[in-house]
Structures are given as C-alpha cells and as structure tokens.
C-alpha cells in the first residue's frame, strides 16, 4: 500500500512539474472565399485542457510571402499559453495586400474563438518570423487592416516580430518591377505607419 501511495504522489508531482495536458486542433479554416483560400487560410491551435484566461501567441511563419507553411514552433510552446499557428495565401497567387488581409482575418478568428481554447481576448500577442514578422507589424501598425474586421489594433497585448522587413516587402517591390536593392517606404511598409501612441 505504501508503494502505491508513493507512486501516486510521484505521478502527481510529475504532472504538476510538467503542467496540464496539451491538446492540439489542426486545420481550422478562417477564410473560405475560394478554393485557394479554403486550402491555405487555416489555423492550428495548441492549448491546455481546462485552462481559462490564458495569454495567446498568434504565430505567422516565414517564407518570403511566397512559401512556407503554418506551424507551432516548439520554442514558444509554454505552460499557460495558447499558441495559434496561422497559414495564409502566397504571392504571386494573390497580392501582398491580400496576404496582409489574411493575417488580419486570422486575428479576427482568434479574437472570436480563442476563449473556447482557454485564451483571453485581452491577452493576444502577434508574433512571427521573417515574412511573418512583416505581417504582424503591418497588421498592428496599419490600423485599417484590423478595423475592417471591427477590431482595434491598440487592443492587442503586444507584437513580437522576428526579422520582419520594416520597409516595403521585397515581394511587393518585385511585383512592381522594383529592384530588391532599392528600398522604398510606402503604405506597405510597417515603418510608414509608426505612430506616436
């Protein structure tokens, strides 16, 4: 009996040490305008079973706006955090503005659905690497993208871009026939939308 009790205590300790059991739901569609949107515009959600009011990291993958795939990086999976990996459409199938709109639409989906996965609408952080960093910067700084979905960019808890371009993205410049060595800052550059607030 003592051995069984000791084993139960040890197992409870392991569960407490490693946190709650994580669940994962893959391939939830957030935009279905056409067949291509239906295929590409999906999210994966990793969350702790039974959790409530958790911070949410919405992760956008890199790939130059022309490739890559939705992911939930192991490095950001932490106890107490809901992580949403976002897929989006690529150039040249759609224009860069449409890709940014995909990012905003994904944020709308997170805002409207994250509570059922234990997340909090007041604790949504946007993050991404490379092209993903560019997308989260555009969605957060050019308020018109989220405003289209009745969301206020100022209500985001934070934005954490990794290696995202602050000037107009090279894929947008390429689509206009502008050399990738010629930097421009226009309405498709995050730094164009930097605000004092």
Where are the model-predicted features located?
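Short beta-strand element of the alpha/beta-hydrolase
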Residues: 53-62
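Sec-dependent N-terminal signal peptides
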Residues: 4-13
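Short beta-to-alpha linker loops that shape the active-site pocket of alpha/beta-hydrolase fold enzymes
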Residues: 63, 87-94, 165
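Short amphipathic alpha-helix adjacent to the substrate-entry channel of hydrolases
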Residues: 69-86
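N-terminal cap/lid segment of alpha/beta-hydrolase-fold proteins
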Residues: 19-51
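Primarily recognizes the serine-hydrolase "nucleophile elbow" in alpha/beta-hydrolase
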Residues: 111-174, 186
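Alpha/beta-hydrolase active-site loop
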Residues: 94-115, 138
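Serine-hydrolase catalytic core
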Residues: 183-197
């Amino acid at each position: 009996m003592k051995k069984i009790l000791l084993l139960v205590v040890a197992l409870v300790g392991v569960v407490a040490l490693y946190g709650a059991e994580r669940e994962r739901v893959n391939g939830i569609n957030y935009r279905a305008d056409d067949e291509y949107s239906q295929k590409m515009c999906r999210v994966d959600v990793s969350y702790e079973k039974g959790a409530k009011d958790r911070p949410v990291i919405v992760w956008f993958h890199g790939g130059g706006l022309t490739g890559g795939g939705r992911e939930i990086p192991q490095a950001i999976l932490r106890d107490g955090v809901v992580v949403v990996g976002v897929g989006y459409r690529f150039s040249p199938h759609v224009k860069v503005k449409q890709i940014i709109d995909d990012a905003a639409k994904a944020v709308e989906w997170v805002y409207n659905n994250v509570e059922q996965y234990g997340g909090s609408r007041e604790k949504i952080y946007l993050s991404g690497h490379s092209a993903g960093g560019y997308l989260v910067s555009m969605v957060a700084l050019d308020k018109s993208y989220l405003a289209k979905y009745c969301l206020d960019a100022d209500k985001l808890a934070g934005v954490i871009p990794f290696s995202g371009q602050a000037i107009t993205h090279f894929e947008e410049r390429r689509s206009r026939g502008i050399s990738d060595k010629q930097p421009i800052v226009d309405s498709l550059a995050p730094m164009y939308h930097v605000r004092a607030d």
